[in-house]
């Protein structure tokens, strides 16, 4: 749940009323306030509440080359909604020499945590399964432009990309990464399982 200040700043940024730097300042302020609350409640591990993210998984997955987002409209409970889904567009890899917003977000959180004794910053990232769920099951693709139908090669590259990304966070002082994976719930969804069967 994002604070109203961030929601309003995001809206203003989208409408061109404020700059990216001004939006970041609002996020910084709210994240610092959140960490202060977490410490006050004696939590040994603190997070930034994912306050910088628009989507819990896509903002993270966009850190990888070969992965992009696709804007769609979808009817949900009778209402037309704008949604984004991830799509594999090329070879998936993590380039640590590029500028990564998620690493910058980590650096700021880490700097806040270091102000408090006995407090460790925790980085939350989405699990790799979301790449496959979005590209194959949500979008109904049976192959990718780069890998074709060779899913095993894609799996290998995604695993390597995650290893390289985690190593980069380690180099930036991260010692606690939480990998969030919501895909387990799909395993008890008959509609989902039928989609898996249909895709082979």
Residue ranges and their predicted role:
Residues 1-200:
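Domain-level signal for soluble alpha/beta catalytic cores
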